[in-house]
């Protein structure tokens, strides 16, 4: 694939993730959009590493770190959402002000 095609795909995924993160009212949807953003960043890291830096694997190593962060977010995020749901009976972002009781 050409560099431009991969970058357009990554920009498309990133834009969908940002739009979903800004407009979502549900915490689960916001977590999924955050995963889309992280995957778009991974695509960029691997693409630039492949096209411009064939011998060194800096982009690949960065993408492994981002995958590790995404895995931690995927493990901790739903646990936090389920805890909030048990206490508030809602996963809507605007109804989960935890500072007011």
Curated annotation (Swiss-Prot):
GO terms under cellular component: chloroplast thylakoid membrane; NADH dehydrogenase complex
Q: Where are the transmembrane segments?
A: 2-22, 32-52, 61-81
GO MF annotations for this entry?
oxidoreductase activity, acting on NAD(P)H, quinone or similar compound as acceptor; quinone binding
Does Chloroplast show up as a keyword for this record? yes
Query: What Gene3D superfamilies does the annotation carry?
Result: 1.10.287.3510
What's in the keyword line of the UniProt record?
A: Chloroplast, Membrane, NAD, NADP, Plastid, Plastoquinone, Quinone, Thylakoid, Translocase, Transmembrane, Transmembrane helix, Transport
* UniProt superkingdom: Eukaryota
Oligomer and partners? NDH is composed of at least 16 different subunits, 5 of which are encoded in the nucleus.
Its recorded name reads NAD(P)H-quinone oxidoreductase subunit 4L, chloroplastic
> In which organism is this protein found?
Vitis vinifera (Grape)
Organism lineage string: Eukaryota, Viridiplantae, Streptophyta, Embryophyta, Tracheophyta
């Amino acid at each position: 694939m050409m560099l431009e095609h991969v970058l357009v795909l990554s920009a498309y995924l990133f834009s969908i993730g940002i739009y979903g993160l800004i407009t979502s009212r549900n915490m689960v949807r916001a977590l999924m959009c955050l995963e889309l953003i992280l995957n778009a960043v991974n695509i960029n890291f691997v693409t630039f590493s492949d096209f411009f830096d064939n011998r060194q694997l800096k982009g690949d190593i960065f993408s492994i770190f981002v995958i590790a962060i995404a895995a931690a977010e995927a493990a901790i995020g739903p646990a936090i959402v389920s805890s909030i749901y048990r206490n508030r009976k809602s996963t809507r972002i605007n109804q989960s002000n935890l500072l007011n009781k």
